[in-house]
A protein has these predicted regions:
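Acidic, contiguous N-terminal accessory segments
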Residues: 2-12, 16-122, 341-349, 353, ...
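Feature activates predominantly on carbohydrate-active enzymes
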Residues: 23-24, 67-289, 330, 334, ...
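Acidic-residue sensor for enzyme active/binding pockets
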Residues: 70, 230-232, 296, 347, ...
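Flexible loop/turn segments at secondary-structure boundaries
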Residues: 132-134, 160-166, 234-240, 291, ...
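Generic recognition of stable, solvent-exposed alpha-helical segments in well-folded globular domains
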Residues: 137-140, 208-215, 269-276, 322-330, ...
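Active-site neighborhood of glycoside hydrolase catalytic domains
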Residues: 240-246, 250-357, 362-374
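Flexible, acidic glycine-rich loops studded with aromatic residues
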Residues: 342-347, 352-357, 363-513
Length: 513
């Protein structure tokens, strides 16, 4: 095995101008050995729309609409830089490339770059329920996302561990379950899942006011990043049932049941609450997508619930799990009536789903492939490659995490495929084990660089993990100078550098492209 690792680790890397840019552009050419001065990057000439020229417009005309809008041509010469693009967004992407050249390009070779994204959706999810970090953290990560060409931030705002969004029609949600006893999720769990009020000296938590969220949305819009809010249902909803116990399932004896943290799909009050919440959510977030969760509903209380049984009888259902399909379908239709499109984790596909709903595949890629075959739009986010709460090096070297070894090399091997239903991909940072801003950035960088390159760079560009690692190291050094934390690539184990994994039986899994 040592010999195999040695081959995979073959280095002797020399950074060139191309290797300084992440994500790698579609086309890059150098103008001989002429070199530019840094000042040449500061005030580019902008040729936008019709001024971009017939040659550029013709060149991008065959691209998908989203790619045309983000496409640009950047020429950097001894006398300055010129940007050609159809839209302000294309100009913005070119400016971000100029910034990366300034941060990481040591060659200073004059060059021409023609560039556009491979996928429409290039995203990051941050779990704010389990560990609340606040708007300044979010804005800081938005800056990094923009530098990487990412264009979608998914905020996981509600879960059992805390409700993080102000709902003015239901202030109890933030008064009662935005604060808890336990700094980390593990502490809260060990202490018996206790909530607290904001004034409690032992309370940990917080929430976003609607003004906070509008500020985040506006900030993201300036960076051409959409913000997708997630309101979990029907599972992962203990905090809602704690706030409104009258909405929990009820058995034949009249006893309220909430053993599985699920909302009750038989209670009309559940839908009134969700519609109230979503009405305020869509007023805050202009994004066409609203994430409704849909994962890991346990359904333990539904079979004995008189309201759920009545719903099943009224709808002609023969299986309890059809109640999840009822709830998801009803909320999807409500969102559609209000001009929005529902997104949900891949479980929503299991019990029938309106055609316009988007499926986010997390349990590997199979759910996404099935959804695409059924005609649904898909965002690939498999836990095998895109879960950044997983270890990124050997367990003995790393802070407490979950899951399998998911190194930079391993993430870089992923490809979402070419099915036209696939909108793109997304990294997910769940925060049960990630309580601080510094820890979050440690888990994100440099692995998020790989997601950015997979989402942007053309498939025709052959992947070279050694060359990519060199570019990642350079960009990570630049981010550190800007005040970001990150994984220590200098101490990464040979096992992780080679992109290896070990099965539960101890067998070695080698990366493949």
């Amino acid at each position: 095995m040592k010999g195999r690792i040695a081959i995979l680790l073959l280095t002797a890397v020399v950074l060139t101008a191309t290797s300084s840019i992440i994500p790698a552009p579609a086309e890059y050419t150098c103008a001989g050995d002429a070199r530019y001065k840094t000042e040449a990057l500061s005030r580019p000439r902008i040729l936008q729309g019709s001024r971009a020229g017939k040659a550029f417009r013709t060149r991008v005309s065959g691209l998908p609409r989203f790619a045309q809008e983000e496409a640009y041509e950047l020429t950097v010469g001894t006398c300055g830089a010129t940007i050609r693009a159809l839209t302000p967004e294309g100009v913005f992407r070119a400016r971000q490339t100029l910034r990366k050249l300034e941060l990481t390009d040591t060659s200073r070779l004059c060059c021409t770059i023609f560039d556009y994204p491979r996928y429409e959706h290039r995203g990051l999810m941050i779990d704010e329920s389990r560990s609340f970090k606040g708007k300044e953290f979010i804005k800081k990560e938005l800056d990094a996302m923009a530098l990487l060409g990412l264009n979608s931030l998914h905020l996981h705002l509600t879960d059992a561990a805390g409700w993080r969004i102000e709902i003015k029609s239901h202030p109890e949600l933030t008064e009662r379950v935005a604060w808890r006893i336990g700094y980390t999720y593990t502490d809260w769990e060990a202490g018996g899942y206790k909530f607290a009020s904001a004034g409690d000296p032992d309370a940990y938590g917080g929430y976003y006011s609607q003004e906070d969220l509008k500020e985040i949305v506006a900030y993201a819009a300036e960076l051409y990043i959409q913000v997708i809010p997630e309101i979990e249902m029907p599972g992962h909803s203990m905090e809602v049932n704690r706030t409104y116990p009258e909405l929990a399932c009820i058995d034949a004896s009249g006893r309220r049941r909430n053993s599985s943290w699920d909302l009750c799909p038989g209670n009309e009050g559940t839908f009134r609450l969700l519609e109230d919440v979503l009405s305020e959510v869509i007023a805050i977030f202009p994004c066409k997508y609203i994430h409704i969760g849909g994962d890991e509903a346990v359904m333990r209380d539904w079979p004995s619930c008189v309201n759920c049984r009545a719903r099943m009888e009224a709808e002609g259902f023969t299986e309890v799990r059809q109640l999840q399909g009822y709830m998801v379908g009803r909320i999807c239709r409500w969102l559609q009536e209000h001009g929005r499109t529902a997104v949900g984790w891949d479980e929503i596909l299991e019990t029938g789903l309106p055609r316009d709903a988007v499926v986010m595949s997390w349990r590997g890629s199979a759910g996404g492939e099935k959804a695409a075959a059924a005609g649904h739009k898909v965002i690939m986010s498999p836990n095998t490659h895109c879960y950044f709460d997983y270890y990124q090096d050997l367990i003995r070297k790393e802070p407490l995490a979950v899951g399998e070894l998911t190194s930079l090399h391993w993430v870089y091997t992923y490809d979402p495929g070419d099915d036209p239903h696939v909108l793109g991909l997304q990294a997910n940072l769940w925060c049960e084990k990630v309580p601080t801003v510094q820890h979050a950035e440690y888990m994100l960088y440099p692995r998020l660089f790989a997601i950015a390159e997979i989402g942007w760079s053309p498939k025709s560009r052959k992947k070279d993990p050694v060359e990519f690692r060199a570019r990642a190291h350079s960009l990570l050094d630049a981010l550190r100078k800007l005040g970001y934390n990150g994984f220590d690539m200098d101490t990464e184990s040979d096992f992780a550098i080679a992109g290896l994994r070990r099965t539960q039986k101890g067998e070695i899994i080698y990366p493949s492209f």
